[in-house]
Amino acid sequence: MAKPLTITSSHSHFSLAWRAYFEMTKPKVVALMLLTVLVGMCLAVPTAVPVQPLIAGMFGIALMAGSAAALNHLIDRRIDGMMARTYNRPLPKGRVSAKRALIFAASIGGLGFVVLYVLVNPLTAWLTFASLIGYALVYTAYLKRATSQNIVIGGLAGAMPPLLGWTAVTNQFHGHALLLVIIIFTWTPPHFWALAIHRRAEYAKVDIPMLPVTHGVEFTKTCILLYTVLLAIACLLPVLVGMCGPMYFVCSSLLSSVFIYKAWQLKYRDRDGLAMQVFRFSIYHLMLLFMALLIDHYLWS
């Protein structure tokens, strides 16, 4: 009787450990990021994306993004343990040790780099590595704790995925790819500031100088509203350069209008839970916007 119990116990332990490591890669965040990578790939060519850069590129970028997320968990483990939103993460709860988290992050990051360098191209490998360093070290380890503009400056690393997808297919920079980077770069501040308003007390408790902590909630609401207007303009850039057609224009205009309206509500008609509604809508905004880019590309071309 003991042997089956041991097998069951071992299987259960392995399953729990696997889930803990998987959680450290922030799979939902990476999934949204991979959508923008895919759109970058598809928009880079007029026909179907070649199979090798598609599969190897998505796999390698996903591994390195997961590595960056795991490093974020490792670096933030102390403050994560003090915040209600993050206290149950694997490192604060002791489900994964700091040493094993570092080994895991280095392993999948190294594998991802090799995949991109060998099977895709060196340019994409190095750009993805730069994004990893920008997010995990420049933003998480320094900017996040150093300035209220942490999200604005550090947002560049998180805005890179469409460019990575583009270079994975073409092995070169292109102005159209940079327009996609600008969209995500402009989207990032209102997205995170809405969350920061909702979690202001927690950020203040752990001495993270998010904008609502350093400049107040009302100032942050104003900044969110202004950035949603700026984002609406950025979202029209692909139309202005002839990169997209009427279908994307309509979808972009509708999404931008709703985002601006919600930001206006947050500023002038705030109520309990509205900041989190704005935060959640921003996720759908980016997802639907890039899906519209993808669909329009094949309709327009």
Curated annotation (Swiss-Prot):
One biological process term in Gene Ontology: heme O biosynthetic process
PROSITE patterns named among the record's database cross-references: UBIA
Transmembrane feature ranges: 29-49, 51-71, 101-121, 123-143, 150-170, 177-197, 223-243, 244-264, 281-301
Keywords attached to this entry: Cell inner membrane, Cell membrane, Heme biosynthesis, Membrane, Transferase, Transmembrane, Transmembrane helix
First-level EC class: transferase
Localization in the cell: Cell inner membrane
Catalytic reactions on record: heme b + (2E,6E)-farnesyl diphosphate + H2O = Fe(II)-heme o + diphosphate
Top-level taxon: Bacteria
Pathway: Porphyrin-containing compound metabolism; heme O biosynthesis; heme O from protoheme: step 1/1
GO molecular function annotations of the record: protoheme IX farnesyltransferase activity
GO CC annotations on file: plasma membrane
Record EC number: 2.5.1.141
Transmembrane helix recorded as keyword: yes
Membrane topology qualifier: Multi-pass membrane protein
Disulphide linkage map: none
InterPro entries the UniProt entry points to: Protohaem_IX_farnesylTrfase, UbiA_prenyltransferase, UbiA_prenylTrfase_CS, UbiA_sf
Note in the entry: Carbon 2 of the heme B porphyrin ring is defined according to the Fischer nomenclature.
General function of this protein: Converts heme B (protoheme IX) to heme O by substitution of the vinyl group on carbon 2 of heme B porphyrin ring with a hydroxyethyl farnesyl side group.
Sequence similarity: Belongs to the UbiA prenyltransferase family. Protoheme IX farnesyltransferase subfamily.
Name of the molecule in the record: Protoheme IX farnesyltransferase 1
Natural source organism: Shewanella putrefaciens (strain CN-32 / ATCC BAA-453)
